[in-house]
Amino acid sequence: MKINFLWTACLIAITGCDSPQNHHSRIESGETKTEKQLENLNFYGTYEGILPAADCEGIRTALTLNNDNTYVLRSEYIGEKDAIFESKGSYHFINGRLMELAQPSSNEKSYYKILDGSKVMLSDKEGTVNQGVLAEYYILKKK
């Protein structure tokens, strides 16, 4: 009985020591895979479109993503006088293709999801995109 218990304890100890290392390498290869997929998309460049707005005809938007993880976001409220805004900051990927754009001067954050190499879509911080009839109006297309 004592021998069976001893063998079981040894087996658990050996197996327990080996698992975290394998789990860590699986996480690293998953991150590497995501990075390679993003590189293959060639998502750097300028994306343009007109986003919906409640108080004007729309917001003409241009988002430029640079390969040094910086961005420029230009927003023009159509039909409004003196309503052009430009923000600059850095972006990083939160989960797969979800980008968080951070503006250092105001601590504001916005989120875009890369759909493919030619389109990004305005999103929330969880990566949820509009699926309704207005979904196409939240897409910016690469110039």
Regions found by a protein language model. Name each.
Residues 1-2, 143:
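Absolute protein N-terminus
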Residues 91:
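Phosphoinositide-dependent membrane-docking surfaces
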Residues 17-86, 100-143:
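Lipid interaction determinants
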Residues 94-98:
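Short, conserved beta-turn/loop elements at beta-strand boundaries and strand-helix junctions
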Residues 2-8:
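Sec-dependent signal peptide recognition
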